[in-house]
Amino acid sequence: MAKSATIVTLFFAALVFFAALEAPMVVEAQKLCERPSGTWSGVCGNSNACKNQCINLEKARHGSCNYVFPAHKCICYFPC
């Protein structure tokens, strides 16, 4: 009985050891820089339309309506 408990303990210790050695894969997020849309005119009230325009016309990664004094503007997000 003691021998089987020792084997189980050693097996568990080896499992923990190998799990500790396994390095998790970390994917670094790409930093995005923002700038006002060059193709949007007027006040931005529809973030989905802004996003589509930024992606399709300006080749940005993302777009959204953000408040930039004095009104909401379409802001596009590009890789820095």
Swiss-Prot record:
Which of UniProt's keywords are assigned here? Antimicrobial, Disulfide bond, Fungicide, Plant defense, Pyrrolidone carboxylic acid, Secreted, Signal
Leader sequence segment: 1-29
Q: Where in the cell is it found?
A: Secreted
Query: Where on the tree of life does the source sit, at the highest rank?
Result: Eukaryota
Pyrrolidone carboxylic acid found at: Q30
Annotated Gene Ontology cellular component terms: extracellular region
User: Which function does this protein serve?
Assistant: Confers broad-spectrum resistance to pathogens. Possesses antifungal activity sensitive to inorganic cations in vitro.
Quaternary structure?
Answer: Forms oligomers in its native state.
Question: Under what name is this protein listed?
Answer: Defensin-like protein 13
Q: Which organism is it from?
A: Arabidopsis thaliana (Mouse-ear cress)
